Amino acid sequence: MTRSEGDTWNLASSVGATATMVAAARAAATRRPRPVLTDEYAEPLVRAVGLDVFTKLASGELDPDDLERDVGFARMVDTFAARGRFYDDYFAAAGKAGLRQVVIVASGLDARPYRLSWPAGTTVYEIDQPEVIAFKTATLSRIGAAPTAELRTIGIDLRQDWPAALQDAGFDAAQPTAWLAEGVLIGFLPPEAEVRLLDSITPLSAEGSRFAADYGSLNDASQASTEQARRTTEGWRRRGLDMDIAALTYPGKHTDVAAHLGADGWATTTFGLADLFAAAGLPELTEAEQGPAATLSFVRAIKS
């Protein structure tokens, strides 16, 4: 189903299913002999969602290589593991720099407030759809998980007035903040909503604040991109999942996040997926393994 203004979803459908896919990949990565990252909460969260293909991937019943070949997403598990590690390292560096206020927008099924070692005095704000926040909180509570920082959750759509909700939850704009928008600015918001998101973050960011995100579009409407999306959609359907990446992304020219932040006084550094693989100690992507994710950019920024 094509995206529309004000549409809704859950973790088993539409764009929400991609959050479950990423969590399943983190669970699979955690099972490896020398894991790039460790997320012990990913598997129980994926099981609770109940999508069969992702439950099997998370639990080890499904060979990741077989799935990646079938859906046409080479090195999928490595890709999401490297991305997760990139942002985990970003938060570690922010903590060492003295930042004690964190905002994760569209947090999905990642349990960073539970699985990372935060410095004493850190407050983490998580923003996502109300149903996603409620589901994750309830599931983690059932398995006895406890946050490793002060956690404040805000259930709201990013297309609504989330800055007001964030401040109502106690966010202090006078304190430097470490922001994260993982897997958000890659076509899952309308282009104008991407700009609003960035333009809302900057005035809430004191000097020394940091920002990290991936950006671009998983479907640029080119013939090659459209054909790749078709093959991937057919692969997921063979696995019993109706997930059409092309239909999940909004059309239009998406935002060059690094350039936009740079114009607003942020010092930015950009990376490619190959940089993330190298930093994680993973074998580099071959030419045959280059897919839509390899076209995305990654940015870290500091507010001056």
UniProtKB/Swiss-Prot annotation:
InterPro entries: Ppm1/Ppm2/Tcmp, SAM-dependent_MTases_sf, SAM_mthyl_Trfase_ML2640-like. Its EC number is 2.1.1.-. S-adenosyl-L-methionine binds at D128, D157, L158. Keywords: Methyltransferase, S-adenosyl-L-methionine, Transferase. GO terms for biological process: methylation. One of its GO terms (molecular function) is methyltransferase activity. Pfam families: LCM. Coiled coil: none annotated. Exhibits S-adenosyl-L-methionine-dependent methyltransferase activity. Belongs to the UPF0677 family. This is Putative S-adenosyl-L-methionine-dependent methyltransferase MAV_1058. It comes from Mycobacterium avium (strain 104).
